[in-house]
Amino acid sequence: MNQGRIWTVVSPTVGLPLLLGSVAAIAFAVHFAVLENTSWVAAFMNGKSVAAAPAPAAPAAPAKK
């Protein structure tokens, strides 16, 4: 581990909770942003089905010569 000397500066009893807490806070912020900025995620999480996207139209057959 090339970053092992960090524990000579910061005690693991302080550093690990800070690291894990910051990861949890970032994950919460990302999930909150997704829920606030999309309309379908909240509906999906509440059990509503999402309408399927329409299939693209088939390409036209080439004309015979």
Swiss-Prot record:
A bacteriochlorophyll binds at residue 31. Residues 36-65 are periplasmic. GO terms for molecular function: bacteriochlorophyll binding; electron transporter, transferring electrons within the cyclic electron transport pathway of photosynthesis activity; metal ion binding. Residues 1-11 are cytoplasmic. It comes from the Bacteria. Disulfide bonds: none annotated. The keyword GTP-binding does not apply. The keyword Membrane applies. One of its GO terms (biological process) is photosynthesis, light reaction. Keywords: Antenna complex, Bacteriochlorophyll, Cell inner membrane, Cell membrane, Chlorophyll, Chromophore, Light-harvesting polypeptide, Magnesium, Membrane, Metal-binding, Transmembrane, Transmembrane helix. It is found in: Cell inner membrane. The chain crosses the membrane at residues 12-35. GO terms for cellular component: organelle inner membrane; plasma membrane; plasma membrane light-harvesting complex. It is a single-pass type II membrane protein. The core complex is formed by different alpha and beta chains, binding bacteriochlorophyll molecules, and arranged most probably in tetrameric structures disposed around the reaction center. The non-pigmented gamma chains may constitute additional components. Antenna complexes are light-harvesting systems, which transfer the excitation energy to the reaction centers. Belongs to the antenna complex alpha subunit family. This is Light-harvesting protein B-800-850 alpha chain C. It comes from Rhodopseudomonas palustris.
